[in-house]
């Protein structure tokens, strides 16, 4: 017999480590951009499982690919070759504009691998070349080294000394970065658009200036595209807006369409920094994950979603700006790119998220007062209008 909502919540809280702040809602079913809870209530989802469900829920191509691969071969380890991994590698290389790929399981793993490669690259040049510079308000994961690279004091408290060799500077401030750059820096790690920090888009020239500083000091430029990648911003990857190509690019979230898969990509010149045995993982790039990657990326391409995201994102942003004009004392900024949008409010964002949920719309609050909107890439204009109407109602009431 199916468990009721109360039982599910109580049993989850009994067994799961208490590391998540959850809403009292039990997800049961998803289709397109809609989800249903276990009491039959329907919601328009403008959060996509934290920017993960790029094709929405229950996309037939993705479901078919995973189902067929599961019936064929789920796992065999990377000690052997598989055809589906080759297919996935090809489409990731094409989408990222890179040559060599490493598959992992989550964004933090991808970022760990990228920093590890950068450290080995740097130390091969000089034993003191191991510093990694990242940005205040950044988020790169909750594993121990990604924690040190993450620019939020909140995540650092209670763990004693963090991993050494990490330096934080203000995001978008080239002078602050320049003051910390020297020949002991092996890498600069940045999000092309900050996600958890509040959907911050840097000044247009900033990434070009960072690239120049990295080149001057022979430091690798790492772009964390875990949240910004896979058509989310109206380009395959956000770096393509600026034309500044990183030396290492990390990916996760949307690349599996909901299946846990991540990794990093490098150009050919960095392909042999790692030697056999230097890096690896049991599950990364398993056949099931690769089937999800191949289905997701080929569907984004065949359905023309990159251009559609750019178009719908502009429409969405304009609608949010209309709300800003309507509530100038409550909405202080609207920013973002494609379908990665942030609406900054004057007060706390949590009541707005809760009001939207009561009106059957799912959005998120990050950085305390930024309503973050990262819907499935397939969201329709009609569904955008539903989200905007719920935000309008929430703003009117707060």
Task: Pin down the residues of each PLM region.
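Conserved N-terminal phosphate-binding loop of PLP-dependent enzymes in the Aspartate aminotransferase
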Residues: 2-398
